[in-house]
Amino acid sequence: MNKFVSQSTIDTFFDGEHADPFSVLGMHETSNGIEVRVLLPDAEKVFVLSKETKNVLCELLRVDERGFFAGVVPNTHSFFAYQLEVYWGNEAQVIEDPYAFHPMINELDNWLLAEGSHKRPYEILGAHFTECDNVAGVNFRLWAPNAKRVSVVGDFNYWDGRRHPMRFHQSSGIWELFLPKVSLGQLYKFELLDCHNQLRLKADPYAFSSQLRPDTASQIGALPEIVSMTEKRRKANQADQPISIYEVHLGSWRRNLENNFWLDYDQIAEELIPYVKDMGFTHIELLPLSEFPFDGSWGYQPIGLYSPTSRFGTAEGFKRLVNKAHKAGINVILDWVPGHFPSDTHGLVAFDGTALYEHADPKEGYHQDWNTLIYNYGRHEVKNYLASNALYWMERFGLDGIRVDAVASMIYRDYSREDGQWIPNQYGGRENLEAIEFLKQTNHLLGTEIPGVVSIAEESTSFAGVTHPPYEGGLGFHFKWNMGWMNDTLSYMKKDPIYRQHHHSQMTFGMVYQYSENFILPLSHDEVVHGKCSLLGKMPGDAWQKFANLRAYYGYMWGYPGKKLLFMGNEFAQGREWNYQESLDWYLLDEFHGGGWHKAIQDYVRDLNHIYQKNAPLFELDTDPQGFEWLVVDDYQNSVFVFERRSKKDERIIVVSNFTPVLRQNYRFGVNIAGEYLEILNSDAQQYMGSNSTNTSKIVTEDIESHNKAQSISIDIPPLATVYLKLHKVKKVRKMRKTSKVEDTAVKTEKKIAKGKTTRTKKTVADTVSEATEVKPKKTVTKRAVVKKVKNEESAVFPNAEVIAESTSVENNVS
């Protein structure tokens, strides 16, 4: 029996059960004098050195053969700085004693973390490079309030949980240990003795880097430097700006042609950014990049929320990709998944033996559709963990926004559940009040800490006020995916044109609720997987009709109010469904493989985007009813739709769509403004592999009443096509002795335009939200093309979108 520490106490260390290592290990003042006690399994000898003089002060006694050493430092009556000289066989090593260092978490951080109100807990928890008493090392911290013992294990201690048990802060439930001389890139985990005396090996929830699957360790990485938001990036996110989003899965956009392996972040950036810029997209939206164990989840089942996936390289590489996008004038949005997490044992499930991050009751905590677990939003520490993660991605990588996945599954307790499978809220309702409050708090946090960051909801129900400010009962998002519009219009487009007349309202119904929220029109990855066919595959008819239908649909979509989102591959009409394990079918753009069809639709989408960006009527008043008017809404027999878009300066663009394969010659419809109109886009143009039924000359209004308008125009509407007509020149209308109210209104509007006056737009929902936040393949059968590819591009009607946009300036300050 030794005179230093009881054998039973020593046994608890080697049994991995001691909960308070600092009460035993390190330097202690005792009746014997100043004692030093160390736990060094497999060591043979240990000497105490003066840190100042490097002299040996004493040799510690090996009081337990398993590696527990203790001894009294002679002639010493106060604490001093020391090091340990350790002999491992014939090798000697001078080391710092981790148990010689004081606690490093301050009282304020400890209190805020306990309260769950720390804005940036990732700056405290996890693994951080720091200095303590002029010694460099890594400070490890973990929240596990119900664990009996926690140790940090890794490359640096042979993954032995006995060697480095951590200090416990009772008030916050946080465990802490400073380890000197631990270096960047080393692997680590936390070993927990849970409340049921079971050992659990967990990855760090706050790790900045993680191993590539199937390995599961965390990796010591530096906290990325802050990237400031710029005014240019902030402006590009506003509701009155053109927003055309290219949705990308980095693992399958392009792959290495030789081995079908992923490209890294830098290789992707070299190809993706110039492509997106050339195609005219304003934003890139990336499918989730937080580390995830299962490739087939596409990132939507993350475990390492703070770790950019190592599939494509390092966090620094990802940061360079984002920076390259910004230099090209492209904003970057990240899909973010705070709704659920997988049940992999190294993750958050039963973290300390209790349902720490999830609900204990599966009626609340288990997502049966995805076999995942649902976060407990009623727990402050969990909300803090999630909300700060959104801030981390925006602030530390310079991202410009988040798209929150599966919001409906978060805000409804009965989501995808039968009666008896869910628990009502405190008022007996189906709403998840805690999740709703979490979303409000997260949007508020982002808005106050990084004004200008955009927050987008994928919300598939009619929950009211998603993009309204919290003080109006809203969730505080800036935009919401318009799933209703997408489902209705795709349902319409899939029908044979002969039947479309019976479903006319599917293309118009969206306007009934258009201004209830700020909408994004999404043609996302979800629409081209799981047997749903590609977008091209959804279109009816032969090959020519399929492409014509898709071009007409895109034109209708780009003209319709709402920001745009298109999943990769749809810009060139990939024929098969998306496969996350393979690259997109880029070979279709070759003349030999694609016959020019796919290249033509790629050119069309490029022109659409550039025309969209350069014409304010197509985007400026997306959230204001004054920016839109139906001109022909009820011609179901011909499946024709005509509407007008307007800008803040009252510029006008008329969008005309014909969803039958019949040429509508001399089709007359009424317009608001008398004058000359130019055709600036025609999806049936020869260069897009259309039939080339175009309106090449100026289109002049006539004093013929039509559709309750005094003025009208007559044009040829191509088959299965969309046409854009831009007001080019205003014509003065001679006043008759007797005029209708419609004519009076038209004349007044023309006078305003002629004088350069602008319409006064009311405050949009997006403006209000901005203020508030300051606080699833079928084979495509290709038939013989009806129209041959144009060999001589000079004979095409529209050389390119930029020339079109520049050559259609409106006289008299109209454009």
UniProtKB/Swiss-Prot annotation:
GO terms for molecular function: 1,4-alpha-glucan branching enzyme activity; cation binding; hydrolase activity, hydrolyzing O-glycosyl compounds. Its EC number is 2.4.1.18. It catalyses: Transfers a segment of a (1->4)-alpha-D-glucan chain to a primary hydroxy group in a similar glucan chain. It comes from the Bacteria. InterPro entries: A-amylase/branching_C, Branching_enzy, GlgB, GlgB_N, GlgB_N_E_set_prok, Glyco_hydro_13_cat_dom, Glyco_hydro_13_N, Glyco_hydro_b. GO terms for cellular component: cytosol. It is an enzyme of class 2 (transferase). SUPFAM superfamilies: (Trans)glycosidases, E set domains, Glycosyl hydrolase domain. Keywords: Carbohydrate metabolism, Glycogen biosynthesis, Glycogen metabolism, Glycosyltransferase, Transferase. Pathway: Glycan biosynthesis; glycogen biosynthesis. One of its GO terms (biological process) is glycogen biosynthetic process. The active site is at D405, E458. NCBIfam families: branching_enzym, PRK05402.1, PRK12313.1. Monomer. Catalyzes the formation of the alpha-1,6-glucosidic linkages in glycogen by scission of a 1,4-alpha-linked oligosaccharide from growing alpha-1,4-glucan chains and the subsequent attachment of the oligosaccharide to the alpha-1,6 position. Belongs to the glycosyl hydrolase 13 family. GlgB subfamily. This is 1,4-alpha-glucan branching enzyme GlgB. It comes from Histophilus somni (strain 2336). The lineage of its organism: Bacteria, Pseudomonadati, Pseudomonadota, Gammaproteobacteria, Pasteurellales.
